[in-house]
Amino acid sequence: MQPGDARKVALLLGHYEMFFAASAGASAAILGLLVVAVSVVNSDDADAKTRERRTALAGSAFLALVDAFFVSIVALTGGATVFGTSNLVMAMVCLLGTRSLVSGAKRAGNFSRGFPTRRLNIAFATISFGGYSIQLGLAIALLADAQSSALQRALVLVLVGLFGSALARAWEVTGIPRRRLPEPTDR
């Protein structure tokens, strides 16, 4: 490490300070809304498979938001090593959590042929495993090369991806695309 390298690394993460603060706040707010949405939506559905699907989707959205929240909060303490370590830990936690959620959804038949949203369920599971694996690999690479601004930027973009993934799952949990207002009847 050259004499000015530590300052460059600190400056790079400093460029994202506002992003990390906003990310922590946004993920906490969306987590609260997600809990309310799941409570409301699951209360009116008697189908166990649909409830399990929603629970798995909400759980995976929850994992993504918790990942973004903790990585962002810890990143505010500064340093590429801290940022890399928080990404590493959260990626491992989320991979284990995703494995558990997928197992439950599989037992409930959410990946069975003929299940109405089978392809979407498989896509969400694949995106989760892939995204957290990418986060894990980038975190390991950053810990090996803490001066790499490209790796730091890539991990910041992973956080953006986590938000997108969580919002897509939360949208699907609510069932908004499938719920339509009744057609008006002419009187």
Task: Go through the PLM ranges and name each one.
Residues 15-17, 21-25, 48-70, 113-131, ...:
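Juxtamembrane helix-loop boundaries in multi-pass membrane proteins
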Residues 159-186:
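C-terminal transmembrane-bundle signature of multipass membrane proteins
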